[in-house]
A protein has these predicted regions:
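Conserved active-site-adjacent core of cysteine acyl-enzyme catalytic domains
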Residues: 1-150
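Polybasic/polar functional segments that serve as interface/processing modules
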Residues: 12, 155-157
Length: 157
């Protein structure tokens, strides 16, 4: 499990940039939150996954989006930004010594939950610095692929 430092915000629309700040900090890149909010084009409805990919790359990460199921994700050994409940971004930090999934949520801070509960809320899209191992079947490589994958999940983009 990675010890991602939680960042909490009072504005719900800032969840994407806040998660990106946590991920960047994990890779020793500090960027001011207000800068990320501006660069992600955060508006009244927040930002998009495409914004997270673009801004992460702007700050040196090899950001990629993948459609992977919860079982694949919880077995990864590094943090990722995940699309949560089809409306929110949180950071997946890994599993603890008891097998609980550890998340850093911009609205709640760090918390743990069972893998079963995680599966109920995880929206099957995750954002990584580089490729997760093993590589999931679906690499959402282009903006069109990303929009198509989210469309299949019932998310308007």
């Amino acid at each position: 499990m990675y010890d991602v430092i939680p960042v909490v915000t009072e504005r719900a629309v800032d969840c994407g940039p806040v998660c990106l700040k946590m991920l960047l900090a994990n890779y020793d890149t500090e960027v001011d939150l207000e800068t990320l909010i501006t660069e992600c084009n955060t508006r009244i409805v927040g930002c998009t996954g495409k914004d997270i990919l673009r801004v992460g790359r702007l700050h040196g990460l090899d950001m990629k989006a993948f459609q992977m199921d919860a079982e694949e994700l919880v077995n990864q050994d590094r943090p990722a930004i995940v699309w949560w409940m089809f409306k929110h971004f949180v950071v997946f930090c890994g599993k603890d010594e008891n097998g609980q999934v550890v998340l850093c949520d911009p609205a709640r801070g760090r918390y743990r939950m069972s893998p079963g509960l995680f599966k109920q809320y995880y929206s099957n899209v995750s954002f990584w610095n580089g490729d997760p191992e093993p590589l999931p079947v679906e690499d959402i490589a282009t903006a069109a692929d990303y929009e198509h994958a989210l469309g299949e999940l019932g998310v308007e983009v």
